[in-house]
Amino acid sequence: MMRAIASLFILLACAAPQAGWGKPKKAKNVILLLADAGGVATVNAASLHGYNAPLKLYVQSWPHIGLSDTTPVGSWVSDSAAGMTAIVTGQKTRNGVVSQGPDAIRGKKDGTPLKTILEYAEEKGLSTGVISDMPITDATPAACYAQVNDRSAWGKIFLQLFTPRFGDGVDILFGPGRKRIWESAAKANLDIDASARARNRPIYASLNEVPPDADRAIAVVDSGFDLNAAAKRALKSLSKNRKGFFLMIESDAHTDNPQAGLDRLVAFDKLIREIATMVNLNETLLLFTADHSFDLRVTGGTPDKPLLSGLAEWRAQNPRPRNVRIPALQVDGSHSAEEVIVAAQGAGAERVRGFMPNTQLFQIMLAAWGWKP
């Protein structure tokens, strides 16, 4: 009898890991989905705005969720530079600094260059992509591929595309901001076109100009950027690499203009739903988060009226308000310090749970591939 009981305990001990403690699936691809300023309240408001009900966004149905602290070094409230640097390098830095350590002094002194998740992917031979509906040298996309002490140095940021530290650099880069980027470079006596020619990397002025079979392409537009088309085009190109890929897609969810910001977040969520059908989730990690939160609050309202009822009248009386006060919503036009949502599905998503520093997202992505820093 004792022998039988001992045997049963051994069997249970062996079976337990298989019952739910198994290792997370290893990822081939990682897609980082970044809603800039898309805090928890903004995600909630987007659902109420888009569907007149809570919990209707696709990302709100994902099985693995957590909350991420976004505080930078030396402050409670983060900007996009410090917030995204923490996510893609695993190290916190100061506001205004892009993928350099906190020893940097903004605009005055370089700090320690930090290795980004994109650079790890490049080093391993994966394909890489960066897409944003904000200027492609703005702090969030820039943190993936550049190291500078001042986020406003757009020309210097862009030229780092042509001098990669690992691999052959970003394969797919799509976004707006062309005029301002070229102006920034000219003020710093930098020649973008000459650098592009020297590296044999043409810079297209629209997505339509990109050759349909291109594995590597840079497209920087002036206006009319289509995030949906850009993301699908990038996935088509990056998926050709049998080793896998890293792709960061950013959408502007700032709600200083509530109508525009919430519309963009609803549209981004729909795009994410489409992306999930285009990839194999058994080998792809989808990771949704924000670089920082924003001071938006749903303070009233009822289901029989649109969330933004009264906004047009408010705008008519306050043409350029920093703050918005309507029956259901209040917005103070600034970043805020509360935690932001982290949601995940696919390979390695099990690592997303509970409260975490934003630096942990870097570790989650790295671990999904089975890599170590």
Walk through the language-model features, giving the residues of each:
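Positively charged n-region of N-terminal signal peptides that target proteins for export
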Residues: M1-I5
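Boundary at the C-terminal end of the N-terminal hydrophobic targeting segment
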Residues: A19-G22
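Bacterial N-terminal signal peptides
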Residues: S7-A15
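A post-motif C-terminal structural segment
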Residues: A27-N29, A35-T85, R94, G107, ...
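Glycine-rich phosphate/pyrophosphate-binding loops
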Residues: P113, I117-E119, E123-A142
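His/Cys-centered metal/cofactor-coordination and adjacent catalytic loops
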Residues: R94-G111
